[in-house]
Amino acid sequence: MDPVTHMKHEVAKAAASRVQSGMVVGLGSGSTAALMIQYLGDRVRNGELTNIQAVPTSFQSSVLANEYGIPLTTLNEVDRIDIAIDGADEVDPQRNLIKGGGACHTREKLVDARAEQFIVVVDSSKLVEALGTTFLLPVEVLPEAYIQVGKALEKLGGKPELRMAVKKAGPVVTDQGNLVLDVKFDRIDQPAELEKAINNIPGVLENGLFVGLTDLVLVGEVDGDRVSVREF
């Protein structure tokens, strides 16, 4: 296993180890979250974890949870989420995030905002001084409104483009049946204000700014052959 892959496994394992029996767990989406689900499933199968329920944030995490024997539930069926574990595309020094590279940010925000503790798992390349400097901001929009929303985003200083699918003709379609505009901002210095401004645009379902939600970030780091996980 190469050092980078090893690091991702260690971060995922560290996150999965924080889940305790009897908890309701929010399952994130993406490559590191997928590894976390695998380790969580291992703990369920060997009897280390009992009586847990998981709320998936995407079709991907739902399929993985079923594959690894993790009992699933839904937001509407639980009165709490004890812990949510998810990845991120960017993390700033205040632990604000950009998420949505997998077009799952709407359901992710629903689950992560509900959680008593929200843990983010990333590698050090995702740490930035200001959001928007390395990753476009995803905005989920109603299909019939994407042009109108795009013009409104331009007035906010953004440069939107419709996310296109790789293995199908046409745009990416979210689990909710909507489209995604990826918006370039030179730098997002006031993420809370921008999050609200974008969500106030008619036709927007949700954007990928996660402000004030994160309780802990687990950062995987590689130094030569040495792999470590630190908290912030």
Curated annotation (Swiss-Prot):
Record Pfam families: Rib_5-P_isom_A
Active site: 108
Entry keyword annotation includes Isomerase: yes
GO terms, biological process: D-ribose metabolic process; pentose-phosphate shunt, non-oxidative branch
Keywords, sorted A to Z: Isomerase
Stated family: Belongs to the ribose 5-phosphate isomerase family.
Assembly, per entry: Homodimer.
Role summary: Catalyzes the reversible conversion of ribose-5-phosphate to ribulose 5-phosphate.
Name under which the protein is recorded: Ribose-5-phosphate isomerase A
Source organism: Synechococcus sp. (strain ATCC 27144 / PCC 6301 / SAUG 1402/1)
Gene designation: rpiA
